[in-house]
Amino acid sequence: TVTWSGKKDRAGCGGGNWLYAARSLGATRLAGFDLVPVPDEALAIERELITITDLTKRMENQARYDIAISTEVAEHVGSEHADTFIANLCGFSDIVLFSAALPYQGGIHHVNEQWVEYWNRKFRALDYVAFDIFREPFWNDARIPYFYRQNCLLYVKTRWVEMLRTRGIEPTVEPRSLVHPELLLQAVNRARPEGERNFLRDAMILHRQAIGGEAPGADWTHGYGQEQLWG
């Protein structure tokens, strides 16, 4: 596995849940970045560890960390700023844990839902290569929200690829977009009249009968984020 030695960064950190988790695993140097502050009751970590900044503008004189994490944030940044967002993220570390919403995944203020291949091209342009090491092991683990199981990839600066290969970890040069069954069920139910939506029932059938697992604990059939753009 790829580990860090006590330093971590995340772009779009919200209340700092990833920072809290990193600290619990021994990280000692932490920094979070987001566009807007969150209420005190939503904080998982000290507020002073979180910097409020414009993630769409190129950051200068960035500190370097052992790993940078951005999960389900990039879709909230307009496509005209996507290159800058990824450049900022890579400016923090040679190792980046990244996920972003697929098209029609849905959510609040999703203005740039894109396929994995779209983001992969942007990382490749900065000399990073993908390692698809999380999706298969966690695909059917309903304790984890499906969008993490569907979208999480590790991006690593190419100079570290051979080191990872010596540890038996191979890169995925062209990672593919994978649509999780829960997203399919969500999309189908969203298209149904409200009184006919059966996401939780459908997901229970999927998890308990098809794969022998527990049903997910949340109904993700809330509104779709981008329809407001089409008016």
Predicted regions and their residues:
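A generic fold-level signal
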Residues: 45, 147-148
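Short proline/glycine-enriched turn/loop segments at secondary-structure junctions
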Residues: 141-145
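Membrane-proximal basic amphipathic "stem/tether" segments
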Residues: 175-231
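Conserved SAM-binding loop
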Residues: 1-108, 117-120, 155-157
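Flexible, glycine-/basic-rich loop-and-beta segments that form/coincide
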Residues: 149-194
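K/E-rich alpha-helical interaction surfaces of small helical-bundle regulatory domains
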Residues: 112-127
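Conserved S-adenosyl-L-methionine
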Residues: 128-139
